[in-house]
């Protein structure tokens, strides 16, 4: 019995479909039968999971075509950066025997991305890792083929956002504080 459907996400930025830079295809579980699925209890990068039954992957895409302004996008990612810092602090606490963070997902792509992020990316030195991630996404994953929009998106999402997260982690460590909350999205 099929209880879930995975779709291919097609991201648009400034009106352009981002076909490169590691953005396509992003496989996401987006449809599940009532009573057989749920959302992970995570602050960032949460996924829908199917609790029982089979999951199929459709050939069709769904469009993530947000036509809001760049200012809105930047505000949203500033807000996301607070959530990312909170999430990393919770993972650090879990490694020290405190609250655990669930590591399940129905998508193998999501499992691999999460593993690389938690055991690869976050094991690299702060700030340096943002440089490497941008180079990987823009040059090795061919983000430059998406034109000016691809360059802007990859710089902001793979470099600026990741550098901002590291700056906030650094600030918390320097002051000896924890991120209290993600705050309100001011868009």
Could you describe each region identified by the protein language model?
Residues 175-187:
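Alpha-helical transmembrane segments and their immediate juxtamembrane flanks
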């Amino acid at each position: 019995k099929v209880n879930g459907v995975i779709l291919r996400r097609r991201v648009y930025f400034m009106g352009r479909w981002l076909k490169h830079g590691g953005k396509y295809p992003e496989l996401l579980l987006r449809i599940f039968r009532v009573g057989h699925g749920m959302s992970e209890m995570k602050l960032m990068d949460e996924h829908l999971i199917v609790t029982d039954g089979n999951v199929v992957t459709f050939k069709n895409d769904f469009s993530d075509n947000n036509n809001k302004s760049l200012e809105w996008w930047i505000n949203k990612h500033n807000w996301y950066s607070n959530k990312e810092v909170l999430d990393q602090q919770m993972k650090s606490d879990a490694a020290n025997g405190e609250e655990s963070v669930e590591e399940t997902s129905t998508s193998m792509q999501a499992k691999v991305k999460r593993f690389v992020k938690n055991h690869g990316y976050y094991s690299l030195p702060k700030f340096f890792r943002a440089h490497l991630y941008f180079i990987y996404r823009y040059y090795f994953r061919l983000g430059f083929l998406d034109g000016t929009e691809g360059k802007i998106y990859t710089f902001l999402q793979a470099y600026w956002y990741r550098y901002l997260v590291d700056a906030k982690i650094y600030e918390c460590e320097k002051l000896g504080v924890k991120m209290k909350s993600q705050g309100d999205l001011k868009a």
